[in-house]
Amino acid sequence: APRRAWRLAAVSAAGLAYLASETVLKDALTADACRWCRPPGIDESIRDSLVWNDRAQADTLSNLTGYVAAPIVGIGITAIWAASNTASGESTFGRILDDTLPVAEAVAYSQLLVQAVKFSVGRQRPRVRFAQEPGQPGNDDNVSFFSGHSALTFALATSAGMVARRHGSRLEPMVWALGYGLAGTTAFLRVAADEHYATDVALGSAFGIAAGYLLPRLLDDFRRRHGLALLPASGGMTLAGAF
């Protein structure tokens, strides 16, 4: 229980940091002007082939697949499987946390890394570069590299798939198929919406797969080695471990 509390606190803090970087801190963190403005020829060619006339619709659909459908599949199926396979005497809520936290950790920590890259690189979004008429500058104009939607959905799909594999879940094929199907659809829609270039979503997808596979393993190994736990202390909580 103390270890679960520490993990939940850490992933919640990461989630809040991400939300802050997307809201109150975004103006201060994003580049005022693009640092990477001109796309390579292959990006421009793919963009011309895939961009939709109705970019707003593609953007809306990518948000639905990326922020609604993918989490429902990745976390929802994992939670349902955990609840239905709780051992006798085991806490159902504890089992759900144990199985869904690796997924949440992979997403939250990888998204912080994505934000750091986006703000540092300052790549101009294609919708800004190819706009027929210059629009009002915004804090979302120069965060094209690399795609956060793609990284998120592939991290969700991969980490959920790995949890299902670890438990020998009969739902594993469904988790992989639905998760990667939604992730691939989301990546395509980000290009169709003119929000990202093909290289943005390709690297975002690869990063998400790597994060979904590696982060839960690395974090679990670190915790086992150092015995990290969040324990009650006078006036609050303390982080205990062996180093």
Predicted feature descriptions by range:
Residues 25-42:
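Interfacial/capping segments of alpha-helical transmembrane domains
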Residues 41-64:
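Aromatic- and Gly/Pro-rich amphipathic surface segment
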Residues 83-87:
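Membrane-helix interface/capping segments
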